[in-house]
């Protein structure tokens, strides 16, 4: 790509060059073994759709609506929201798209009734009357409500983005098992997408930035790239939490901001309360945890000095067990953690525990440089993003873009891995 741009997979490409082996992905429904022939994406909705006049009332209207918009609209149980297929992806109906669709269905019913009237006056008059009734707001609402139960018109919230081996990107979907770019399909149920395209291109400006932040330390650069690659996979096999530590003007904010923009819909920014120690009797709602469902990158920015970590929360967030949490005034929901938490802070947090369960999860990434005077570029982030549009690329080995610490866990002697001796002293 021109100007050394990175579209999302440079992160993966460089991680691969650090070496890895493919992980033992669990099988999920909808994961294609290779690249199967993709069914055609839904085309434009026809203004005419035949009506089964042998059926009656709201049930007929709902089935007519479902027939028109099968593969184009989905109701999400749990969210109580509709999704619509927009060009090449599912998006939430946040501008009344489902209302517009049910109005189109009512109009199509009138078109069919008018054709009946032209062919048979007696039969057509009754159908015109029913089509007119279908245009009322009460009938439109009833149509939408009953359509939720029609086959293929709804899914559970947990069904969305449920396959961690599929990664939505700007120009399709990447099968992380093979590094193959595929066209997005409605049946993949992908609603999240990275902030840039998949492409294969070198990324010299990003590599230069990494060399400036970690000068002369290729081992750390390689480890960071593996960490970034691992984060994109949605795996929780390593049970790690990354702490980017160092005082200001050292590149860590730019590093983190670019990471958030790259991961796009898979990224969440959480408040420091996510990790702050709480009273043992504090059972209040944890919206800061509930909001993380479906994320792959969770960023926590700037812990207060002297903050003690909530060690049970760290173990849960950097663990493999399902997490239960709720928003205020909402019921609990349970989900599997598919994210890696990255913390940016000037101060090392306080960890009072001495057990391996907490310390083996901590990965410390030190930012030791300080860029001052002529070394500081206030436009660097814009340059990195504008000229380095990240991509998910694969090298000549065509292996899955999964970071490897060893097999796909921490390598022995990895400079980013916290150890009981070096970090507890």
Feature roles, as predicted:
Residues 1-44, 79-114, 118:
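Modules that initiate DNA replication and primer synthesis
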Residues 41-77, 110, 114-425:
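Feature primarily recognizes SF3-like P-loop helicase cores of small DNA viruses
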């Amino acid at each position: 790509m021109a100007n050394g741009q990175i579209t999302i997979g440079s992160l993966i490409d460089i991680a691969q060059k650090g070496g890895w082996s493919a992980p033992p992905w669990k099988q999920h429904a909808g994961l294609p073994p290779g690249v199967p022939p993709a069914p055609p994406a839904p085309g434009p909705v026809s203004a005419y759709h035949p009506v089964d006049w042998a059926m009656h009332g709201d049930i007929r209207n709902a089935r007519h609506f479902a027939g028109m918009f099968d593969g184009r609209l989905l109701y999400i149980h749990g969210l109580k929201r509709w999704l619509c297929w927009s060009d090449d992806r599912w998006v939430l109906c946040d501008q009344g798209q489902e209302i517009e669709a049910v109005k189109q269905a009512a109009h199509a019913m009138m078109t069919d009734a008018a054709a009946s009237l032209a062919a048979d006056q007696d039969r057509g008059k009754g159908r015109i009357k029913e089509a007119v009734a279908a245009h009322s707001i009460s009938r439109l609402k009833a149509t939408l409500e009953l359509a939720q139960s029609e086959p293929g018109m709804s899914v559970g919230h947990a069904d969305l983005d449920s396959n961690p081996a599929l990664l939505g990107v700007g120009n399709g979907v990447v099968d992380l098992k093979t590094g193959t770019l595929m066209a997005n399909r409605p049946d993949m149920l992908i609603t999240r997408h990275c902030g840039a395209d998949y492409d294969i291109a070198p990324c010299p400006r990003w590599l230069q930035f990494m060399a400036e932040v970690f000068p002369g330390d290729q081992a750390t650069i390689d480890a960071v790239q593996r960490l970034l690659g691992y984060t994109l996979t949605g795996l929780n096999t390593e049970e790690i939490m990354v702490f980017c530590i160092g005082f200001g003007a050292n590149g860590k904010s730019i590093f983190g901001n670019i990471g958030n923009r790259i991961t796009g819909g898979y990224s969440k920014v959480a408040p420091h309360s996510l990790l702050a120690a709480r009273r043992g009797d504090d059972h209040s709602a944890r919206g800061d945890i509930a909001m993380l469902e479906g994320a792959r990158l969770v960023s926590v920015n700037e812990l207060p000095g002297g903050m003690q970590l909530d060690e049970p929360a760290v173990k849960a967030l950097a663990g493999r067990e399902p997490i239960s949490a709720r928003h205020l005034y909402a019921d609990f929901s349970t989900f599997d953690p598919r994210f890696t938490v990255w913390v940016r802070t000037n101060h090392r947090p306080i960890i009072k525990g001495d057990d391996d369960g907490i310390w083996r999860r901590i990965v410390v990434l030190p930012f030791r440089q300080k860029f001052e005077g002529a070394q500081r570029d206030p436009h660097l982030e814009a340059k990195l993003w504008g000229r380095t549009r990240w991509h998910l690329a694969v090298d000549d080995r065509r292996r899955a873009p999964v970071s490897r610490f060893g097999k796909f866990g921490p390598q022995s002697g990895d400079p980013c891995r916290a150890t009981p001796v070096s970090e507890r002293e």
